[in-house]
From Swiss-Prot:
Organism: Tamias dorsalis
Positions that bind heme b b562: H83, H182
Listed transmembrane segments: 33-53, 77-98, 113-133, 178-198, 226-246, 288-308, 320-340, 347-367
Molecular function GO terms recorded: metal ion binding; ubiquinol-cytochrome-c reductase activity
Gene: MT-CYB
Major localisation: mitochondrion
Protein name: Cytochrome b
Amino acid sequence: MTNIRKTHPLIKIINHSFIDLPAPSNISAWWNFGSLLGICLIIQILTGLFLAMHYTSDTMTAFSSVTHICRDVNYGWLIRYMHANGASMFFICLFLHVGRGLYYGSYTYFETWNIGVILLFAVMATAFMGYVLPWGQMSFWGATVITNLLSAIPYIGTTLVXWIWGGXXVDKATLTRFFAFHFILPFIITALVMVHLXFLHETGSNNPSGLISDSDKIPFHPYYTIKDILGILLLMLVLMILVLFSPDLLGDPDNYTPANPLNTPPHIKPEWYFLFAYAILRSIPNKLGGVLALVLSILILMLFPILHMSKQRSMMFRPLSQCMFWILVADLFTLTWIGGQPVEYPFIIIGQLASILYFMIILLILPTISLFENKLLKW
């Protein structure tokens, strides 16, 4: 009798993706974040679905509907905070996943990498629109400030902003369309994830050494399924500690005040996971320049395959590049901190220096060091 797992048209796809998939024998815990991101996406879609059952996307009732979810719906508070903090866990896993890709040279699979960058943009767009939905002060003013940046686009900017708003200001039309987009985007993300995996399975996974591992492969199940389950348990542990002990730790107190177009909050800032990009945006005095820097801060990831100058793929055996990589990580932490600070001395200058350093390391220092390391090894 033939095994249904290997013959059934649908089940064999799952089999080739998660069971009989040949995987390198030496991939470390850094390779767990792909599956963790998948779990995060599932959590977000499920909690989001249940929230959408009780949420109303109308300026008059949006804030009250969120309060109603937290007070009156069975375990509504749990669903709401799992969704809000699930987004933070999603971004933590995303940043670590991208960082792993940079460190171990996974960007040389450039189709997989570029789809990944598009996914990052899609997740950021989804998170931004989701933050607008509770219709608190920071929701309203965040939406106003960020959408207003598009007015910096020459010629069509002002028209574009009014078109996105659906009126003269952020209002009912804006909230309704943001809810519609926030609902549809995760499903588009799911489709992109499938494309991401399809491209990855064309080449197989990279590994810490960056060397070809075709001669030493092991089946994904049971080795990496059990390893992924451990990762998922740890992810759920951290998420539930956050949700049950300090659900508002990463949120903004201003968002517990209903949106008021007549009263601007003293410090408008996005959620923590956007602060590094927000700091880069603010460090350039020109509006259009700031918007370009903001977009390029993420888009620059697509240049990594072109800027790879080393004869080795991974940074595992390249101490100078490793050193520069960790300086880049420290720089991103600095930018995140600056993004949450008011626009005044000394934060302005620190932000500007950190922004310059960010682009310098990626565009100039890392490729130069890679060439220097090739010379040291007489390659």
